[in-house]
């Protein structure tokens, strides 16, 4: 938008920045001395899925260290290092985040990962399926069947509702036996 560090008025209508509004009817918020920016996006945060639940199982005491009581507008939640889904959503929102990307979803754990993400309030969410060690992908690549690999990945992304492919050390687990 060509704006870089300028001080100016911002008009908002229905949650979107617009050219202008009726100033006589508008609510005025004095944000002098503050930075105004759109909601934050965390492109790599492990907040749902198999690895998070393994962490919760390994840290049962974590649920007693940091309890958030129910309020008139929030549910209760727990957790210090591995918070519950509701606590996670509330804390991200308090920090100004609006969007998170969960970076590791094993395809066979997709349903549960999406259930947890759906249970996390106040955030737009997406997840990256782990396909770098997916056996079908490795076989297609080994046999130089690139178009079939692409078709399989496209089908997989649709079937498990992935946003982008997470590839970590492609073939690494397979190489180690």
Segments from the language model and where they lie:
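Histidine-rich, glycine-flanked metal-binding segment
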Residues: 2-38
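Structured loop/turn residues at beta-strand edges in well-structured enzyme cores
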Residues: 23, 95, 158-160
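Conserved acidic residues
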Residues: 26-27, 98, 163
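General beta-strand structural signal in soluble alpha/beta enzymes
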Residues: 29-30, 101-102, 127, 167
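Metal-coordinating catalytic core of metallo-dependent amide/deamination hydrolases
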Residues: 118-177
């Amino acid at each position: 938008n060509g704006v870089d560090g300028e001080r100016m008025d911002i008009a908002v209508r229905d949650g979107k920045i617009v050219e202008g509004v009726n100033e006589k009817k508008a609510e005025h918020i004095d944000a002098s001395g503050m930075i105004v920016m759109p909601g934050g996006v965390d492109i790599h945060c492990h907040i749902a899925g198999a690895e998070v639940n393994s962490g919760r199982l390994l840290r049962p005491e974590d649920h007693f260290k940091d309890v958030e009581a129910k309020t008139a507008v929030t549910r209760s939640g727990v957790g210090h290092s591995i918070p519950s889904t509701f606590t996670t959503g509330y804390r991200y929102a308090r920090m100004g985040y609006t969007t998170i990307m969960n970076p590791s979803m094993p395809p066979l754990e997709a349903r549960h990962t999406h259930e947890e993400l759906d249970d996390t309030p106040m955030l737009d969410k997406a997840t990256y399926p782990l396909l770098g060690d997916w056996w079908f992908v490795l076989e297609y690549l080994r046999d130089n069947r690139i178009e079939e690999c692409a078709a399989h990945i496209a089908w997989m992304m649709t079937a498990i509702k992935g946003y982008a492919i997470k590839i970590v050390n492609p073939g690494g687990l397979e190489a180690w036996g």
